[in-house]
Amino acid sequence: MHSLRIRRVPLSKMDKHTIAAYFQGLQDRICAGISATDGGASFKEDQWQRPEGGGGRSRVLAKGAILEKAGVNFSAVEGPLHPKMVTSLNVTEEVEFFATGISIVMHPENPWVPIIHMN
């Protein structure tokens, strides 16, 4: 069993770059743990950019010893709020958004083991 080390960041030092870097590091640690546990395959990475702002890293493991397929994806996107959201939120000035996180999906080889999906 592999343990996941949590790195604590003081709230006073949190900004969007610090938070995104934390999630990228978490993605690295999760992928390393899954690869080590599976033992039969490694992740392939695809980096992408969002024209409106931000981007991410998609990582896929296929045909492993335990997992048929697994994806661990990181994204950090930003930009101006859509006009409908501006109206819905009842804001008068131009507002930007920032969203980041990790999405994980795993499909085991064994059909009796449940699929895993989490964000």
What are these regions (language model features)?
Residues M1-K13:
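N-terminal amphipathic/basic-hydrophobic helices that include classical n-h-c signal peptides
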Residues R7-P10, A32, W112:
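Intrinsically disordered, low-complexity segments enriched in polar/charged small residues
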Residues F74-N119:
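Aromatic- and glycine-enriched beta-alpha-beta binding-site module
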Residues D15-N90:
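Gly/Pro-rich turn-and-neighbor structural signature
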